[in-house]
Each structure stands twice: as structure tokens, then as C-alpha cells.
Amino acid sequence: MAEQPADKKSTFKKLGARHKARRRAVDLLFEAEARDVDAADLLTERADLATRDQSVAPLHAYTRTLVEGVADELERVDGTIESYLQDWTLSRLPAVDRAILRVAVWELFHATDVPPVVAVDEAVELAKELSTDDSPSFVNGVLGQVVLVAPQVRAAAAATRAPRQEPEA
């Protein structure tokens, strides 16, 4: 058997279902931005297409969770990303990097079943697969700052979701 090149874009490790779901979410967010359509609407369109056309793979539940989550929190997610960009604006980033960062930031803030290190590592892997040579270190740098505030954001979100205890009389 011939030896495969050890190039950075051709990793032969087995990709898990969550990695594939994240990649699909990045693809959908990228497409929604390129077509200037709402990501949640595109998600619905793709789900409908998958039910009508068997050649189109159905969407993984986690892909739906990510795209819906990012779409619902887009302003907050983008604001967070922008606050950690040094000498850059969100609009100057490659569109694929924006999509990768949006997925990762949403996961850091809302996916309590995903350890922060996993969210960052997955984003860096996606940047290696899908973007420029400089993108993995850039994505890692931005997310390295976001990860520092993620526990407070998660705690605040949990506190607002928790049922309030009425004082006993």
C-alpha cells in the first residue's frame, strides 16, 4: 500500500459524528451568509429537501442545534467575537472563519455537555480543514480569550433559567 502524504489538510483520523455535525453547521452558516438568507430558514429548507430527496443526507440533530443556536444568538455571538478581535473587524474575516468562530462561541456559551477544550480544538481542526494557513492559530487565539469568560456566561445563563425560590413565610 502506498504511503499517503502527511499534508495538513488530509487527516485520515476517523471523524466523529459531532465533528461532522459541526462541519455541516459551518457549511450551512457560510452558505446562509453568502446567500444573504436567515440560517434557520436555510436549515428548514435543507431538512425539507432531505425528506424529499433520498440522495440528500438528513441533518444531524447536533447540526440543527448549532445552526438554530447561532441564529438565535447571532448578535450576542458576533459581539463577543468582535470584542476579542485586535485590529480587525468581523466583516474583514474570511467568511468561513466567521462561521467557525460562531459555532465555537455558541458551544462555549451554551453547550454544557461540551468541554471548552473540545469546542476550541474542534474549531481549530475545522479551520485547518476549511480555511487559510493562518486561520487555525487565529481561531485558537480568539477562542483562547473567549474561553476565559465562558464559565461566567454559562453561570449567568443558568441563573436566569433556574426557577426562583419563593421565600417561606
Swiss-Prot record:
Coiled coil: none annotated. InterPro entries: NusB-like_sf, NusB_fam, NusB_RsmB_TIM44. Gene3D superfamilies: NusB-like (1.10.940.10). Keywords: RNA-binding, Transcription, Transcription antitermination, Transcription regulation. One of its GO terms (molecular function) is RNA binding. Transmembrane segments: none annotated. GO terms for cellular component: cytosol. One of its GO terms (biological process) is transcription antitermination. CDD domains: Terminator_NusB (cd00619). Belongs to the NusB family. Involved in transcription antitermination. Required for transcription of ribosomal RNA (rRNA) genes. Binds specifically to the boxA antiterminator sequence of the ribosomal RNA (rrn) operons. This is Transcription antitermination protein NusB.
